[in-house]
């Protein structure tokens, strides 16, 4: 899958007017989202010997494992770190329907949007943590994305903030004390080789950017911010 995207930041004071404007633009009420993401990394770094005449390098990537638990309130949120103290919690957490993603670096060069290759799959049944451990991966860290989502044509518009576990209260708290919101507008294209669909997605995002101009400035972040490779 190839994901075409643009990003912006808005202050907490701008949220209400942005939600109102997006509801008017899309013709829908915002959907509340709450996503729990865990990042797993290889337990050992793999450094293959590159023989003379062999080009390229073999990179190892972190795996992002995401579960949509928007129907749960904060009291029901189960942290991987906390769940290790409870067999029931770790079992319930491991057997949720997790979505796996390996994300490559976005394309380099002068681009109108961020274009990133993503390999994704889901584990609908069974222990996802045992599966990851069988791949020689280990848990690294976790976070939660809370916010709102709209759909406009083929584009998904998300306004979210990152939360992390508060070790004192055992609830989740905002990571960024400035309380800013991250806006992500994206379109998923099935295949990198589908040039027509990719071009159409880029044009559609450019249209969204123009329509939201004055409300927010959608742009391309530094591609290094997307680097999930093991160094």
Curated annotation (Swiss-Prot):
One matching Pfam family: Med18
Domain of life of the native organism: Eukaryota
Coiled-coil residues: 191-218
A GO molecular-function descriptor: transcription coregulator activity
TM region(s), chain numbering: none
UniProt keywords, alphabetically: Activator, Coiled coil, Nucleus, Transcription, Transcription regulation
Record carries keyword Iron: no
Function (record text): Component of the Mediator complex, a coactivator involved in the regulated transcription of nearly all RNA polymerase II-dependent genes. Mediator functions as a bridge to convey information from gene-specific regulatory proteins to the basal RNA polymerase II transcription machinery. Mediator is recruited to promoters by direct interactions with regulatory proteins and serves as a scaffold for the assembly of a functional preinitiation complex with RNA polymerase II and the general transcription factors.
Subunit and partners: Component of the Mediator complex.
Family as reported in the entry's similarity comment: Belongs to the Mediator complex subunit 18 family.
Name under which the protein is recorded: Mediator of RNA polymerase II transcription subunit 18
Taxonomic source organism: Yarrowia lipolytica (strain CLIB 122 / E 150) (Yeast)
Lineage summary: Eukaryota, Fungi, Dikarya, Ascomycota, Saccharomycotina
């Amino acid at each position: 899958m190839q994901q075409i995207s643009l990003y912006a930041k808005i202050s907490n004071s701008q949220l209400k007017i942005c939600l109102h404007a997006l509801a008017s633009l899309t013709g829908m009420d915002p959907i509340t989202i709450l996503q729990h993401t865990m990042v797993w990394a290889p337990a050992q770094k793999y450094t293959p010997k590159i023989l003379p005449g062999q080009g390229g390098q073999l990179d190892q990537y972190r795996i992002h494992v995401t579960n949509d638990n928007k129907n749960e309130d904060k009291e029901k949120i189960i942290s991987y770190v906390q769940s290790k103290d409870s067999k029931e919690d770790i079992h319930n957490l491991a057997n949720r329907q997790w979505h796996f993603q390996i994300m490559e670096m976005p394309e380099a060069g002068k681009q109108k949007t961020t274009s990133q290759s993503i390999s994704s799959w889901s584990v609908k049944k069974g222990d996802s943590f045992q599966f990851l451990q069988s791949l020689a991966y280990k848990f690294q860290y976790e976070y939660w994305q809370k916010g709102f989502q709209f759909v406009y044509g083929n584009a998904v518009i998300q306004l979210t903030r990152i939360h992390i576990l508060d070790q004192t209260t055992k609830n989740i708290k905002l990571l960024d004390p400035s309380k800013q919101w991250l806006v992500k507008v994206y379109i998923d294209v099935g295949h990198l080789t589908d040039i027509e669909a990719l071009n159409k997605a880029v044009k559609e995002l450019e249209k969204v950017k123009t329509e939201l101009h004055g409300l927010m400035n959608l742009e391309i972040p530094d591609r290094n911010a997307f680097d999930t490779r093991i160094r």
